């Protein structure tokens, strides 16, 4: 069955030793014989399993599914194989993160190692220790690449190798020496640290914490009253903090340094104690310098750029609002507008807001329209007189001069306002999944749709499809009349082109259409139809419209203009005018051959021809016409009734079949 034990052992030598050490660290001992048996079964039913092994939990779950399918088909799977498979799968679960791949280039000050502590509350345990375990991120993401498990063992379990005189130096509770950043050896797998929880078996023994300290320029000394750390974890060394200091830069470099405010530190301390470690964004705020620390006398006061963290409640509201109502719902637009105008958001903050609340496809749309808006704004800045010195890198927060938060904090107010307008505009163009943006020309008012609802839909579509504000306003005013229903058009028509300067055209249209479709409006229409009065400066006529002259009050056949034309044509063709009234209808001066009237002057219907012939008697239809029976001798006179019945009795009687012939015996 499968390959031999020696081949399996030589093929997976390094992987088997790594699995044994991994299980041993978890408190489970598995014999090499059982592991070889497991890999024999895997070789037989899972030929896709890589030769160098895998640490991806998804692959081991797939192995379990395929082994179950093999068991259902009648193959015998030993019980020890199931036990070993379950143990290995459970041992690999701590290596899986919420996102299977974490970029190691985002670590501040180091591209190799980043340790980020997290904690969670448990009802059964009052205190827990925090232990940072190394996670081989590229191995989990790409389990088929060549991996040296001996080097990986040195990275994952340094404290075991420390006892043997190898591995990196540990930073204990009483040591304050930070860990340096050395280049990776050739062939070593880059790793990133992911926080994992472990409940202490022996509470009397203090845990060992492996911490990464950021560079000195990103650190600050906490205030004396602040206490960092979690229950069951030793405090951080003096002068070090387990998270970097938000950069603080002055807009006036010549001003002397001011006292470092404690408000920012208090916010960070509070969020850290509450477990809010995922929302440390810092919108820029400009605060006036204290007296004596700003500019000299006679100079304008200086301000200092500081960061204040976003509340986690804002990010949660943004995420829930987008999920429940959509990114362009009235609630989300109002919330985003209040955040945008209530904070001095830099490009980094806009990217954080979009990433935390939008789906990947929606964020891609936002980023695309952001870049498109930046290109348009840069063209306007260059065409201005004088040109505005704001480039695309500054509006996007990229490049050598604007890629960091501290550099973006120094952006001028004009650049901040341009970024705000561009990002709000890009957010409005985000479409919900499965929806398409219709053309503004196809937005029409329904027969029973209120006029304000129609205008709101029209403005929303125009805002997404037309970038120029002036052009959008003209299109909305035009379509608000052209695409309205007939009732609203008749109400708006007296106002078209006559709205006073300074007044909003759409507002005047909405006022004119107020109440259309209601009971009061229907009653007014009925009253106007009966009395023909003029109400509200609007003439309501319900007569027919002439298709010849376009006037109201008569039809084309009664149009006086058409009759005059006919008379002129007749006089031209015949050379003479009709002498008198039509002899056929007696109500018009025209020739009888041209009379098209169906009724005369008295209202009597007229036939198609002037004279009709004698009506013909109805003809009898049938095979045998009925002839009256008259007995002989009474021709020309009425015979007696007895003679009539006697004659009828002498008529031959026929049935459907002839009478039967009865033979008479002699």
From Swiss-Prot:
UniProt PTM comment: Myristoylation is essential for retroviral assembly. Alteration of the glycine residue leads to a block in the budding of particles and an accumulation of Gag inside the cell. Specific enzymatic cleavages may yield mature proteins.
One GO molecular-function entry: nucleic acid binding
GO cellular component, one term: plasma membrane
Pfam family, one: Gag_p24_C
Low complexity: compositionally biased ranges: 624-640
An annotated GO BP: viral translational frameshifting
Zn finger (CCHC-type) location: 544-561, 580-597
Task of the protein: The products of the Gag polyproteins of infectious retroviruses perform highly complex orchestrated tasks during the assembly, budding, maturation, and infection stages of the viral replication cycle. During viral assembly, the proteins form membrane associations and self-associations that ultimately result in budding of an immature virion from the infected cell. Gag precursors also function during viral assembly to selectively bind and package two plus strands of genomic RNA. Endogenous Gag proteins may have kept, lost or modified their original function during evolution.
UniProt protein name: Endogenous retrovirus group K member 9 Gag polyprotein
Gene: ERVK-9
């Amino acid at each position: 069955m499968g390959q031999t034990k020696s081949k399996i052992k030589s093929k997976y030598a390094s992987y088997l030793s790594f699995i044994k050490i991994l299980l041993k660290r978890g408190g489970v001992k598995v014999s090499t014989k059982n592991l070889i048996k497991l890999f024999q079964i895997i070789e037989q039913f899972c030929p896709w399993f890589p030769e160098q092994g895998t640490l991806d939990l998804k692959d081991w779950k797939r192995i379990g599914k395929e082994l179950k399918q093999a068991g259902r088909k009648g193959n015998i799977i030993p019980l020890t194989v199931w036990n070993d498979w379950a143990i290995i799968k459970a041992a690999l679960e701590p290596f899986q993160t919420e996102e299977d791949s974490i970029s190691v280039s985002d670590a501040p000050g180091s591209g190799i190692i980043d340790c980020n502590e997290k904690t969670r509350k448990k009802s059964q345990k009052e205190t827990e220790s925090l232990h940072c375990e190394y996670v081989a991120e590229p191995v989990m993401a790409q389990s088929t690449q060549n991996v040296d498990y001996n080097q990986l063992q040195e990275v994952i379990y340094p404290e075991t190798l420390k006892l043997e005189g190898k591995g990196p130096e540990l930073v204990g509770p009483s040591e304050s020496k930070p860990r340096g950043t050395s280049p990776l050896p050739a062939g070593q797998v880059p790793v990133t640290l992911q926080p994992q929880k472990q409940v202490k078996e022996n509470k009397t023994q203090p845990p060992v914490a492996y911490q990464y300290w950021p560079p000195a320029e990103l650190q600050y000394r906490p205030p004396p009253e602040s206490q960092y750390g979690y229950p069951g974890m030793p405090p951080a060394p003096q002068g070090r903090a387990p998270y970097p200091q938000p950069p603080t830069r002055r807009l006036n470099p010549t001003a002397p340094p001011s006292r470092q405010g404690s408000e920012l530190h208090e916010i960070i301390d509070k969020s850290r104690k509450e477990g809010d470690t995922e929302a440390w964004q810092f919108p820029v705020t400009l605060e006036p310098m204290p007296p004596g620390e700003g500019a000299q006398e006679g100079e304008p006061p200086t301000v200092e750029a500081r960061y204040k963290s976003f509340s986690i409640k804002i990010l949660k509201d943004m995420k829930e609002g987008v999920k429940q109502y959509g990114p362009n719902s009235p609630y989300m637009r109002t919330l985003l507008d209040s955040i945008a105008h209530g904070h001095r958001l830099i490009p980094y903050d806009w990217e954080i807001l979009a990433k935390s609340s939008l789906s990947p496809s929606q964020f891609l749309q936002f980023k695309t329209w952001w870049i498109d808006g930046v290109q348009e704004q840069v063209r306007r800045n260059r065409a201005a007189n004088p040109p505005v010195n704001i480039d695309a890198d500054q509006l996007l927060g990229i490049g050598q001069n604007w890629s960091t938060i501290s550099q973006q904090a120094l952006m001028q107010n004009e650049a901040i306002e341009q970024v705000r307008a561009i990002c709000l505009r890009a957010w409005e163009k985000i479409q919900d999944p499965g929806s398409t943006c219709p053309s503004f020309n196809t937005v029409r008012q329904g027969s029973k749709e209120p006029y304000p609802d129609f205008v709101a839909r029209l403005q929303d579509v125009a805002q997404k499809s037309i970038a120029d504000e002036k052009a959008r306003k003209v299109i909305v005013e035009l379509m608000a009349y052209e695409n309205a229903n007939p009732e609203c058009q008749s109400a708006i028509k007296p106002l078209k082109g006559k709205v006073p300067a300074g007044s909003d055209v759409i507002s005047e249209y909405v006022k004119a259409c107020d109440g259309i479709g209601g009971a009061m409006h229907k009653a007014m229409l009925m009253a106007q139809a009966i009395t023909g009065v003029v109400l509200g400066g609007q003439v309501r006529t319900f007569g027919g419209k002439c298709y010849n002259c376009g006037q109201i009050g008569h039809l084309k056949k009664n149009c006086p203009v058409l009759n005059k034309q006919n008379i002129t044509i007749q006089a031209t063709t015949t050379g003479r005018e009709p002498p008198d009234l039509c002899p056929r209808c007696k109500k018009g001066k025209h020739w009888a051959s041209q009379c098209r009237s169906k009724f005369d002057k008295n209202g009597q219907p007229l036939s198609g021809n002037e004279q009709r012939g004698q009506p013909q008697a109805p003809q009898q239809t049938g095979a045998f016409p009925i002839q009256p029976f008259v007995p002989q001798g009474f021709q020309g006179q009425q015979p007696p009734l007895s003679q009539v019945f006697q004659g009828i009795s002498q008529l031959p009687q026929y049935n459907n079949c002839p009478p039967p012939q009865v033979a008479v015996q002699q």
